[in-house]
Amino acid sequence: MIARILIPVVVFTLLPYLWIYKRYGKLRLKSLWQRVLFWLPAFVVIAYSAYITILPNFLPRNPVLIDIWFVMMAVCAVPQFVFSLFSLFGWCCMRLLHGHRNWGKLLGLVVGAVAFFCFIYGFTEGFPKMQVKRITIYVPNLPKSFEGYRIVQFSDIHLGSYYGWRGHLPQRDIDSINAEKPDLICFTGDLQNVTPDELPEYQALLSSLKARDGVMSVLGNHDYTYYMDVDDEQEIAALEKRMRNFQRSCGWRLLMNEHVTVHRGADSIYVAGTENYDKPKRTNVRKALYGIRLGSFVLMLQHMPKQWRETWPSTINKEKDEDGDVIGPDRKDSLVVAPQLTLSGHTHAGQVSVLGLRPSMFTPYDYGLFEEEGCQLYTTSGLGGTVPIRIGATAEIVVITLKRK
């Protein structure tokens, strides 16, 4: 992860120190040891970041190393960057307006301090925080027997991020899900951070999830080997098989471009699920929907919300035949059913949200409930993350009640 942003980290760290040294420190730091102490935090951050980049895989196996990196950034880089931005802006205004005081410097001190405390809060208090969100979704073709059907969705738990003082959080989350006594539990991907080695200690806990119609799941981008430093095809296949077998050993119904039927007496609905949409791309929507009659209610599980567009009626039915009332995986001209409700995760709601502004807002359908062409999508903020920080984008489990429109 750090390897992909090493150059921005170096720039983000060094430039503020250069500005502060040039504007405020050059005349005050007269001795060599004073200058060394001034520059030491910046070079420690850069050296540590470089060290992490040479470790194999997307993330180091020991998550404590990432925690140390975030603390170092919070102390040695973020406040300095914020202060420098305001100081530079104030200096430019002072020069343009021929003023005598740089008010940006004072404002930068305040905002830099706020940024520091927000960073620490998000790391220590914001990340563990969790809410139970309840929504009611109305659909036109829900069978009578499924009126009031309750689904609990959880996503992006990233079990490799829980250890030490965070170790109790998965138990809390699973207990909260079971307390809802749902009809169906849906997991929408990213069980691990990097490797299946993170999972065995949680098998008993995940197996304890209980719902009348069981637990159904799909794989997220982290549930493959994309973030591992592995090239051997046999090893890749073995690692991905371990992930699939682990979920099945927990009693979950893993949906790999396929669907299952849920019955209530003579009525039924379908739950479909696709593999990952991007990096790696394994998805096959038409295969997942094969055999579903038109007019049926379909709940679709997809890890990435940007794939939702592929399930809209205008997209999925670009070509139609005269009597194609059954979906075919290979017949591109067959008439296909558009899932009325899709559940996704992946975005974590940006993990930082301030006044409704969040990094993921430029990603389509990044958080919340959306409706297009009679189809609805709910994208959850998820429960965890590879980056152990949340500010304003609270982790959640989602309780969905289905009602007939």
Feature map (PLM): residue ranges:
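Non-catalytic terminal accessory segments
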Residues: 1-128
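Short N-terminal secondary-structure initiator segments
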Residues: 1-10, 96-101, 128-133, 157-170, ...
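Short, charge-rich amphipathic segments
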Residues: 16-27, 97-114, 136-144, 172-185, ...
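Beta-strand secondary-structure signal
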Residues: 85, 134-136, 399
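Generic structural motif
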Residues: 88, 95, 140-142, 405
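Hydrophobic alpha-helical transmembrane segments in integral membrane proteins
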Residues: 116-142, 161-165
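Soluble catalytic domains of enzymes that build or remodel membrane lipids, polysaccharides, and related
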Residues: 145-405
